[in-house]
Amino acid sequence: MTCPSPCPLGQQATEPDANFFSLTRRPRILRIFNVPKCFHGEGVPFVRMAFWKSGAGLAALVLMAPILPQILAPTFARAQQWSGIIDPSRAADWSKAGVRGGIPSRTMVCATLNPGATTSQINSAIASCPNGQVVFLNAGTYSGLSGIMFNGKGGVTLRGAGADKTFLVFTSGVGCHSLASDVCITAADTNWRGGPSNSANWASGYALGTTNISLSSVTNLKVGSPLILDQLDDPSDTGTVFVCQDPATVPSCSLEGNTTNGQRPNRDQVQIVQVVSCGTVSTAGQACNGTNVTITPGLYMANWSSTKSPGAWWATLPISGSGIEDLSLDHTASTGSFGIEIQNAIDCWVKGVRGIDSGKAHVELQESARISVMDSYFYLTQNAVTQSYGVESLNSSDNLIQNNIIQFIAAPLMMNGSCSGCVIAYNFVTNDFFTASTGYVQASTNQHTAGIDMLLYEGNIAPQFYADNFHGTHNLVTVFRNQFIGNDGACYNGAPPYGESACNNNQVAMDIRAYSRFYNLIANVLGQGGTSTGYQSGSAPIYKIGGGNSANGVTVPADSVVAPTLMRWGNYDVVTAAVRWCGNSSNPGWATTCGSTSEVPTGLSKYANAVPATTSLPASFYLSAKPAWWPSGKAWPPIGPDVTGGNIAGVGGHAYTTPAQDCYLNVMSGAANGTGSVLTFNASRCYSSASVTLPLPPT
């Protein structure tokens, strides 16, 4: 709707939004309405408001303005799902991950295009589409495309009729600033590690959780903009959290260094926040008029320091509120390009997409925050050795990679740079096709570079978890209620191009290498009967802990700090054939299952974790309830020590298949071992409409 100016006082609210009506399950929320938003001349069609009873009567809270950056909802101080299990110094508020308020369900179509439409026509439709509307591509094949571009164009959805109906076939990519990509969602200016559009010294405000900082300059910074915070790497190892990428460090912390990924050189610790207010202004889009800046979320890490030259940098014209939905992207003829590149963005998304044979990553997220990649299917890359990624995140924060199917890709879930506060959840990974070595089980979830911290992996089913030491150190990663099998359905057998047979090498469930410290491994189901041979020793162990590596004349030695800083609690593995609650003598199985050996790091001088007082665990560390897209008859949670009667064989009944795995096996008719050609996919045939989970109203 178009609001009159000025907006009439007390303009009538519309009926409750069906997509958010399920939120009224919360007992204190009465109704949720779409209310026309007419203030500040922002041109936003509506906001969503929740009403609840308070001591003073009826109160209201703005929940969601689906077009502009979502900065109106306050941050609630509330207990985290992990409270009482993980020490607060070792975890983050992961409920903030993904598009703030959820991906908007846009219904207004600004342009409808038909098969035969050219790249130029699609790009023109995007460029001219009003804020909050949809460019719709009818069913059919759109051939010969050479790069779809959102050049700073926010608030637009490019939507097809379904990934099994609308087919986009690319012959080349488009220059996405410094990269080639078949679809480019990026800021209007070039802001990157080698040439920031704007930069400043970060003068004060470094404490864990702080939301108030000061900068030396705020040129071109606006309320609602993403702000990239960083600092110098650690010059030496003090035996605690260590941020390092330089192979010349003694001893070496990295095999290859990290000078070509998203962070500024030697400034690998990064958090991207959003400006809430600055100086005296707090209206979205207004230019900052003072150097005191309020941010959201607060700082996740406790090691920010004035001694490490902390700094900030930002785009002048970042993009927000744009997304790609419900179509198929065929990259086979577009050699060497990324599939979808998202840069200098906030609150953008990829949903219901099928990607085929990308030149590099199917989706790369760079200098971006609160990006959602969900309900999609990614198949094959052109190079099955290096840069063969499903979803790649670097120099990002608070991204949500959720409920995707990833098949026949060497590195499906690649953290190739900082991703503080990111959530990787409920993805199904099969057949990590890798041609560098025969019979080799390739890792599914890589932490690959320096600066990775405060990640959450939850509910994933995949062959292997891997924290490597190729490009630097990682800290404070949480792994909750996943199944890591320690094997894959099939591995490359040396017969080009796609020959496969049974795997026989690197059959490890979790490989956590040197300088991957302060990890939390909780309630996971690990290993495969008949394959896994040892708990943390032998040829096919459940765990490899703290190991070094050598390559190109560089040796990263084993790290004796990894094991004593590691928290393991409530995990089931097929070698132990029991759940391990190994904290202290009061825990079940202490003398028998645990051998009277604690796996909870209680005695550390920093980042210590007390033994949890209970073996009870929440269903999720980022969701407050079963999500709406989860089938009503499906076990929730699907994986963990408290799960019984699961339908995945050989793991003591502690694991059920997830919706993504069910979609792959039962709807798409995928092979159990992950082999075969690309499959037909439509997210709507597998998943219910998603709704958001919002904080409780204040009491």
Predicted regions and their residues:
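Extracellular "leader-to-stem" segments immediately downstream of a signal peptide or signal-anchor
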Residues: 3, 20-25, 31, 38-39, ...
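Cationic, low-complexity basic patches in intrinsically disordered or flexible, solvent-exposed regions
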Residues: 12, 16, 38
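Ligand-binding pocket scaffold of soluble enzyme catalytic domains
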Residues: 130-133, 155, 159, 269, ...
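Glycine-rich beta-solenoid repeat tracts in large extracellular/virion proteins
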Residues: 146-151, 166-195, 311-318, 336-344, ...
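Right-handed parallel beta-helix
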Residues: 155, 320-331, 346-357, 369-382, ...
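Predominantly extracellular beta-rich ligand-binding scaffolds that present long acidic/polar faces
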Residues: 157, 469-588
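Short, solvent-exposed linear motifs at loop/edge-of-secondary-structure regions
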Residues: 218-233, 266, 272, 318-330, ...
